[in-house]
Amino acid sequence: MDQQMALTWGLCYMALVALCWGHGVTEAEETVPLKTLQCYNDYTNHIICSWADTEDAQGLINMTLYHQLEKKQPVSCELSEELMWSECPSSHRCVPRRCVIPYTRFSITNEDYYSFRPDSDLGIQLMVPLAQNVQPPLPKNVSISSSEDRFLLEWSVSLGDAQVSWLSSKDIEFEVAYKRLQDSWEDAYSLHTSKFQVNFEPKLFLPNSIYAARVRTRLSPGSSLSGRPSRWSPEVHWDSQPGDKAQPQNLQCFFDGIQSLHCSWEVWTQTTGSVSFGLFYRPSPVAPEEKCSPVVKEPPGASVYTRYHCSLPVPEPSAHSQYTVSVKHLEQGKFIMSYNHIQMEPPTLNLTKNRDSYSLHWETQKMAYSFIEHTFQVQYKKKSDSWEDSKTENLDRAHSMDLSQLEPDTSYCARVRVKPISNYDGIWSKWSEEYTWKTDWVMPTLWIVLILVFLILTLLLILRFGCVSVYRTYRKWKEKIPNPSKSLLFQDGGKGLWPPGSMAAFATKNPALQGPQSRLLAEQQGESYAHLEDNNVSPLTIEDPNIIRVPPSGPDTTPAASSESTEQLPNVQVEGPTPNRPRKQLPSFDFNGPYLGPPQSHSLPDLPDQLGSPQVGGSLKPALPGSLEYMCLPPGGQAQLVPLSQVMGQGQAMDVQCGSSLETSGSPSVEPKENPPVELSMEEQEARDNPVTLPISSGGPEGSMMASDYVTPGDPVLTLPTGPLSTSLGPSLGLPSAQSPSLCLKLPRVPSGSPALGPPGFEDYVELPPSVSQAAKSPPGHPAPPVASSPTVIPGEPREEVGPASPHPEGLLVLQQVGDYCFLPGLGPGSLSPHSKPPSPSLCSETEDLVQDLSVKKFPYQPMPQAPAIQFFKSLKHQDYLSLPPWDNSQSGKVC
């Protein structure tokens, strides 16, 4: 009975002690692996967990992560460079780890349980007999009072109900220890007493020092109980034998003798951050194991161990007198919802360029559930900047983003990450791989403006100087074009060489030139030659050679057609055409312009070889094999070119000389009715100009020929009879009737009895007979009679080759170009004399010194002619150029 009462009081005492310890009781702390554990899944096929252990515990213990859905399964983990989703406690140095758990059974109702276990079995066990493990209660209300000669230390102890308590005042005694404050308790002084107070004499203390004392209850030596004393007010910590530091140690349990079993143990302080221990007990060997709670941790002191406490209730000490107590690793865990812990794989980032802008595109990992929506976070920056200074854009349900306001010629970097939204949650995925690109170079606006201004100014300068240069080049080019109007030789339009009166004489003496043709000739005579400077061309031409006109049989008197001056062209006697002999169409010269050009491109035969016998009827049949191609004097002829300087200024005497020359030659005069009108045109127009025809009649209607654009040798002017041909070139200076030199041609008449001439072989040349040249050599005022030694071509006899009075005995009359102008070659001061060099019958070379300077009296109404050059000239523009046609290889014996 007494023992039962003592047990009851002991339990009550233990309960009171537990209540007294309640203020220091705390729950076991979470370990570092449990604090840092975070797990996220892709909600498809795997779970990724990240946690960390302390660096101090690495050499003592190795922790393993366990995943439990139906049963616990260890998870393989590996060291990682960083702690992914949590932070390491500041009081520890962490070692991060990363675990990948293959898992596909995701559901919104699943709760995954994660825990940690050490790789070795940790724990201890103890059998506790109550009577032999009694620890008396701790003294309470310890106080000290001073007096004059002593210090009184008092305390109290509650033993509870004496009927149930195993302890009595006889079973306990007190131990008092005191020391200086800075001393250790191992060096403290102690004393034993059975009273609840003790007196300290002053001699026990050092003056001016602070002492500390503590009291504890212990079993008296005469008690039947055994155990140990109660705890000191301040606990004493001492070192134990060496051993495994990771193992918990110094497990002690003391029954208070009432109803509580107080247990304590110690853990190496460096392992307390990684491993948590708990106290487990069994009241009997067959009873289930239970966990002691709460576990109290003493504040860490100078000791290297950390002490833990836990009190076990002992409701029936007599029934359960032996407890099994153990300290084991305390397994801790927490629940994580999978659908709220999703981390997706990083997206794949690409970039496209759209004209002047750039666009980012990305693709995400395909998930098991396609209805899960995503949000994206895009960052882009200059390559030289840090990501903290980057621009960040958050986009929901988008897979592209346009980039604007990018600087040209700059390198940029971009990255993107993703996480689920809506009913699912998680964390951001890792950043995608950085995509780097460089923007195109764009010219700044200011540069464009400056370049445009520069180009405009440059273009204006180029246009300015270009126009000046082109204008100068044009003027130089134009100045290089031969333009006779710039020379004093052609200030009068060439009237000194071909006066209008001579042309009028041709028109008046030719009955065929009546009507529109005569008016046309008169108009041409009256016009000034100012048109020679541009592209205007002479409208004068001849009739079509296909129309053969026969001169009338009656007498023909031709009055002068010019009002200013008249000149009668000497009659040229020709034989009438044979009525029964057909007329052959003759080639003609092209007078379509101011220059003389041939209608065909082959050389002409010599004149003497083409002369034929006249017909019986007195008509001359010209039969030329081809048209004139060059104006050449016949080689070997005796015709001479008379210097005009010897015959200038003689007035009407030259007309008489021309007539007398013809009479003296012995050739009979030709009747006026038989004289065909003679007209020479010195202008030649290109084929594309519009010609105006001038009809030339041969006398009779049967002898009429078609008017054309050519002057043919078959015309009466250029048709040579069998008799000698007399030509007189003389100016009529001083007389109003003849103001310019005239060309006097006399065609001797062949007797009717003479045989008809064959086809002339040299009809394409104009020959000057010696009589004309001799007449020209006569001094002024004393005309010498012409020498009747002109050669006459007799049919059947070989013709003697006589050279013309040309500077070139070859007979070729070639113009000489000096600068921009053309002259008769060899024209210069002095008299013109015939060459004594023997002529070459088949070579026409360039002539030298052909014409001498002429001094002509200048009248008020017309400029003085300067030289017997070409009558008309034009500026070389457009088609008006003087060119030589190609040589005819068939006429290899002649140059012309």
Swiss-Prot record:
Signal peptide from the UniProt entry: 1-22
Motif residue range(s): Box 1 motif: 477-485
Modification sites for Phosphoserine: S752, S754
Placement of sequence motif WSXWS motif: 428-432
The record's account of how the chain is modified after translation: May be phosphorylated by LYN.
Pfam families, sorted: EpoR_lig-bind, IL3Rb_N, Interfer-bind
Chief localisation class: membrane
Regions of compositional bias (Low complexity) in chain numbering: 220-233, 716-725
Keywords per UniProt: Disulfide bond, Glycoprotein, Membrane, Phosphoprotein, Receptor, Repeat, Signal, Transmembrane, Transmembrane helix
Entry membrane topology: Single-pass type I membrane protein
GO molecular function, one term: cytokine receptor activity
Kinase in keyword set: no
Compartments where found: Membrane
Domain of life: Eukaryota
Disulfide bonds: C39-C49, C77-C99, C88-C94, C253-C263, C292-C310
Residues that carry a glycan: N62, N141, N350
Modified residues (Phosphotyrosine): Y765
Family recorded in the similarity comment: Belongs to the type I cytokine receptor family. Type 4 subfamily.
Subunit details: Heterodimer of an alpha and a beta subunit. The beta subunit is common to the IL3, IL5 and GM-CSF receptors. The signaling GM-CSF receptor complex is a dodecamer of two head-to-head hexamers of two alpha, two beta, and two ligand subunits. Interacts with TMEM102; this interaction occurs preferentially in the absence of CSF2. Interacts with FCER1G; this interaction is direct. Interacts with LYN.
Role according to the record: High affinity receptor for interleukin-3, interleukin-5 and granulocyte-macrophage colony-stimulating factor.
Protein's UniProt name: Cytokine receptor common subunit beta
Species for this entry: Mus musculus
Gene: Csf2rb
